[in-house]
């Protein structure tokens, strides 16, 4: 072992076996400990200050881990795991990291008992597969029987640990209305909820309960000129990804003029090129022009004369969303394949009304009743920028949860109910296995209890007592068919006792639970498979050679 841990012929260090495994487990546990205290409805927030002094205050696991500058490769795996969970599901980022770290810790104990990592990996895969099957067969609640209340309760459960949890009813209703507003049916006839098309704007000032849901797409811009019309009915929208400014010749172009009068003609032609472009756009019937670039005063005059509304400096992501909602095509150039410039009427989008209104304290442009898809916008108010940013993250998580519930039409009880039920089931399942996987499945079952345990600790309750009571209820539910309704029992963290979370309305999307189990298991297995770490030294600029000499000195080339 000592020989292996010396310098290598490749200018690096190698460590293997138990050393690497211990390092990986420690790194994973460190990452999990950072986010552990932010789990649950009474979890605490983290303040992160980056290298230039920007402050972020958040409770969101994915945001915390994204802002950490982690060096250890095993810790990076967990940070990427939280990012993956956030991208795929949108919620459950903290719990997925905690479960993965606990699985690793317990697998390390098995390795120390001389059980081969391959046996543990096999057991973990089997346990994960059984756990997902058990959730789908026994623990899901169909949302059709619960209706809108189920959606609101799922959103409230997601918000409960966040800054907007205190006004959960208000924001949950707003989020459900926003998600329902953007519903459309795809080609297969299935309902889809593209929550990315919901624009979330932030304005600091006033209280968070003065946030509003706006019917239509709210654009944080104003018309280009005061003389323009502020309202257009039956709007035909042109989405342009270039500037409408006086054309100037590129640098390096040289024009030799013998007659001074020709200079004015060149200037006139520069103006005419842009004028012709605007006329081509207006000739198609366009009366609302949105562009990501600038529009100079000369061009604005043409739009004012034509009675059209022109908006400049629109963000590209907003332009793409508006194009999708209105049925427009984003145009990045007017040039066609023949080298001519043209603009087709088919590239225009349509909306019932485009109007500039004063919403809260700001002037916004609202695009209402778009033709291709409906759209909605949420305008958040808060005391300061930190609060508004955290509210936006919380709304994003809640929107993702509502989308998942609407699309999958199933939820599971929250508050540690699923983890406790799976723990009891997998312990019993492990005893039916005759192979070495039995120990790994039992450790998997024990690892899941970290979620109810952490929830209780964060709520300043007696974790040992609460988790023991919870396990007793779930054991009774699985052993005694007459009392199977006890499977909905989870933790009431405010009063510090178990309760029926189905009646209490504490719900989470089934997808959050199943995906987090799968992702956590795969991440733990990825790190568990590692038994060798070779770390190369960064190459210094002044030391070009030296590899061979270092290798001879270390004895790595001796037989």
Curated annotation (Swiss-Prot):
Domain of life: Eukaryota
Catalytic activity field: ATP + H2O = ADP + phosphate + H(+)
Entry EC number(s): 3.6.1.-
Entry keywords, A to Z: ATP-binding, Chaperone, Cytoplasm, Cytoskeleton, Hydrolase, Magnesium, Metal-binding, Nucleotide-binding
Sequence positions that bind Mg(2+): 91
InterPro entries in the record: Chap_CCT_alpha, Chaperone_TCP-1, Chaperonin_TCP-1_CS, Cpn60/GroEL/TCP-1, GroEL-like_apical_dom_sf, GROEL-like_equatorial_sf, TCP-1-like_intermed_sf, TCP-1_chaperonin
Disulfide pairings: none
Positions contributing to ADP binding: 40, 92-95, 161-162, 415, 508
GO cellular component: cytosol
Residues reported in the UniProt entry to bind ATP: 40, 92-94
A GO term for molecular function: ATP-dependent protein folding chaperone
UniProt similarity note: Belongs to the TCP-1 chaperonin family.
Protein name as annotated: T-complex protein 1 subunit alpha
Record gene name: TCP1
